[in-house]
Amino acid sequence: PMVIADAISSLLAQGKIRQFGVSNFTPFQTELIRQQIPIEYNQISFSLTECHPMTDDSLNYMMIHRIKPMAWAPLGSYFKSPSEKTARIKEVLQPLTIKYETQEDILLYNWILQHPAGIIPVVGTSDKAKIGRLPSATTFRMEDQDWFALWEASMGKAVP
């Protein structure tokens, strides 16, 4: 961590970079470097199918230290890997597409965007039609009971 901190400090001082972020760092790994230099971002695996950062204190740590979380693979395995978890989510999500008059992917992005940590989804598609729809994920607020119903479907149990 000290070698990384020294290298980043040098790059910041030289004006070669303006901000520094990490990827997939745990709170303890982040803290080792954060004690030496400011960390602006942590890119983590986060989606409705991969929401452990909500229960392992990763997101709480980032909120405390004002580190902006970026979610890579924000749609998770929802469209890729049928499982008991995705079936539970689909059962809750499909009626919400009617309620909110939107597509499943937009609801999945909206769910992430409503987290109080201010998570920034990293979009991995190059499909222009899908990219064109993405701004609609910011045009409505999912009701809290729907947000929690999706989280519970993902967890397979009542959430804390």
For each predicted feature, which ranges?
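Beta/alpha (TIM)-barrel catalytic core signal, keyed to glycine-rich beta->alpha loops juxtaposed to Asp/Glu
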Residues: 1-160
